[in-house]
Amino acid sequence: ALRAAAVAGSPQQLLPLGQRERKAGCKNFFWKTFSSC
Protein backbone atom coordinates (compact mmCIF):
# COMPACT_ATOMS: atom_id res chain seq x y z
CA ALA A 1 0.00 0.00 0.00
CA LEU A 2 2.80 2.39 0.92
CA ARG A 3 4.68 1.78 -2.32
CA ALA A 4 1.57 2.06 -4.47
CA ALA A 5 0.56 5.30 -2.75
CA ALA A 6 4.05 6.76 -3.17
CA VAL A 7 4.16 5.81 -6.85
CA ALA A 8 0.70 7.24 -7.51
CA GLY A 9 1.48 10.37 -5.51
CA SER A 10 5.02 11.17 -6.66
CA PRO A 11 6.90 9.32 -9.42
CA GLN A 12 10.13 10.78 -8.06
CA GLN A 13 9.75 8.70 -4.91
CA LEU A 14 9.57 5.61 -7.09
CA LEU A 15 13.28 5.91 -7.88
CA PRO A 16 14.65 5.72 -4.30
CA LEU A 17 12.00 3.17 -3.39
CA GLY A 18 12.97 1.08 -6.41
CA GLN A 19 16.63 1.10 -5.42
CA ARG A 20 15.80 -0.03 -1.89
CA GLU A 21 13.50 -2.74 -3.19
CA ARG A 22 16.22 -3.91 -5.57
CA LYS A 23 18.52 -4.61 -2.62
CA ALA A 24 15.66 -6.46 -0.96
CA GLY A 25 15.33 -8.62 -4.06
CA CYS A 26 12.04 -7.06 -5.11
CA LYS A 27 13.04 -5.55 -8.45
CA ASN A 28 9.92 -6.97 -10.10
CA PHE A 29 7.85 -4.45 -8.15
CA PHE A 30 9.84 -1.59 -9.66
CA TRP A 31 9.90 -2.91 -13.21
CA LYS A 32 6.48 -4.48 -13.74
CA THR A 33 4.02 -4.33 -10.86
CA PHE A 34 3.90 -4.07 -7.08
CA SER A 35 1.94 -7.35 -6.98
CA SER A 36 4.99 -9.18 -8.32
CA CYS A 37 6.56 -8.83 -4.91
UniProtKB/Swiss-Prot annotation:
Extract the InterPro entries matched here: Somatostatin (IPR004250), Somatostatin/Cortistatin_C (IPR018142)
Q: Which UniProt keywords apply?
A: Cleavage on pair of basic residues, Disulfide bond, Hormone, Secreted
Name any one Pfam family assigned in the record. Answer: Somatostatin
- Output a single Gene Ontology CC term carried by this record: extracellular space
Record localization: Secreted
What range does the record give for the signal peptide? none
Q: What is its main location?
A: secreted
What name has this protein been given in UniProt? Somatostatin-37
Specify the taxonomic lineage: Eukaryota, Metazoa, Chordata, Craniata, Vertebrata
